[in-house]
Amino acid sequence: MTQFTTELLNFLAQKQDIDEFFRTSLETAMNDLLQAELSAFLGYEPYDKVGYNSGNSRNGSYSRQFETKYGTVQLSIPRDRNGNFSPALLPAYGRRDDHLEEMVIKLYQTGVTTREISDIIERMYGHHYSPATISNISKATQENVATFHERSLEANYSVLFLDGTYLPLRRGTVSKECIHIALGITPEGQKAVLGYEIAPNENNASWSTLLDKLQNQGIQQVSLVVTDGFKGLEQIISQAYPLAKQQRCLIHISRNLASKVKRADRAVILEQFKTIYRAENLEMAVQALENFIAEWKPKYRKVMESLENTDNLLTFYQFPYQIWHSIYSTNLIESLNKEIKRQTKKKVLFPNEEALERYLVTLFEDYNFKQSQRIHKGFGQCADTLESLFD
């Protein structure tokens, strides 16, 4: 007989309120899980020497009431010094639970193992849910994956960003595989992850498949596609969206320049290159590019010839100036990819592709929900102009 069961029998024997018993048990369990989540996030237990000089630490807590079907529980939400910890147990600003299975699914999606969930459920409810049972409950999240891939998208997107990032995945052996990601912004400035494809390496077949899926989900026209210049991708884009203009990421170009010139020249070259994408208009940008190439070609002939032969360097100047800063590079989608990597550090690796997809869709849905409440910088000032670019 577990301690939980013993306490429950004593409660019943004393004819006390059974809801109060479950409320206090749930309160204890939830607070314990919050502390366990912070330990997992930091990577060490309280007072562990591993945490010394780790770059982050515990930083007290704040109180929150949380409404459950058993009554109000008092939670002590732990904080980290860097302010990056967000407990999976509670949605942002959430103050009410919906259902046990929803909590199980949420924990599973965010990386808590089935065994850890099983342990906490046993403490909360007094009977054992095996990891296999938890896993079966969590498979409901697979429906979210299908819904994500099949949902209807807007007909027109002003900007489409394409970029890949790598995450560890087990297929017999563990290796990092490429997540091909498409992120779009509507003329009104609504930003969202539109879709993704998983493959062992970045490849044009996967990009083609992803763009085909986006068309099937309703995207008819795209004004501008921003990429890092993956070989062959420009042709794939032209086949899918022949009217779309294309922009090469100028930050990638800048990094490439830095890697091919002498260290003594690097700072000057990079500073001069910035004048090309910070010009007041297209005419001045073209002149800045010509001056840049003319100055450095005698010393770096092959590098400058490669730059001369690179297409789609200044396409972004054809769009309203209010959004130039957002569309001359893939920085926007790269920021998303960095956040994905940060979030998945806790997970280490994914046991199969289905687990990876469940996790990605959770992250993407959360991202899309947050972005749905915002208008991306600059788009609100030129929405009518951007809309007029479509047929």
Swiss-Prot record:
Record Pfam families: Transposase_mut
Transmembrane ranges, per UniProt, are none
Give the GO terms filed under biological process for this record.
DNA transposition
Q: Which UniProt keywords apply?
A: DNA recombination, DNA-binding, Transposable element, Transposition
**GO MF terms on file?**
DNA binding; transposase activity
UniProt KW DNA-binding keyword: yes
Q: What protein family does this chain belong to?
A: Belongs to the transposase mutator family.
Q: Matching NCBIfam families, A to Z?
A: transpos_IS256
Q: What does this protein do?
A: Required for the transposition of the insertion element.
User: What is this protein called in UniProt?
Assistant: Transposase for insertion sequence element IS905
